[in-house]
């Protein structure tokens, strides 16, 4: 569930993902408890480290490419993505403009996975697009293991 702790709890979601402008990670962890998944967005090494210290289970980082879902998001440089990945011990998930044509550009960045919206929901065959992205994501992660 994105950004709404209350709705996540009410609907029995497995967890919640929040941005930097939402309530603090420690406060969210106290509300949702230790068994729910907590993801926190980070755009800097400092934010990523703070998110991990606040009890995040994973860090969302991006936009890594130009994206249609967040027009104001400036794409992140791969080197910053690598520094963020190296600064925390929890998984880092890249988001923003990721599709089958660019996902492998993230190889070697240290990210543990990707979050994708438009490349699946905008596809003619969403199931096929998701399967292709899953395979490419595995290749991307394997490239830096």
Locate predicted features.
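Conserved SAM-binding loop
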Residues: 1, 17, 40, 113, ...
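Glycine/Thr-rich beta-alpha phosphate-binding loop at enzyme active sites
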Residues: 10-18, 37, 41-86
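Small-residue (primarily alanine) positions within well-ordered alpha-helices
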Residues: 48-51, 56, 94, 111, ...
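Structural loop-to-beta junction motif characteristic of Rossmann-like glycosyltransferase folds
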Residues: 13-15, 90, 111
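Glycine-rich phosphate-binding active-site loops on the catalytic face of alpha/beta enzymes
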Residues: 20-30, 60-72, 100-136
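Alpha-helix-loop-beta-strand connector modules within alpha/beta enzyme cores
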Residues: 1, 20-43, 72-100, 133-144
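Amphipathic, non-transmembrane alpha-helical secondary structure
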Residues: 5-10, 25-26, 45-53, 78, ...
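Short beta-strand segments at enzyme active-site cores
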Residues: 1-2, 59-61, 94, 116
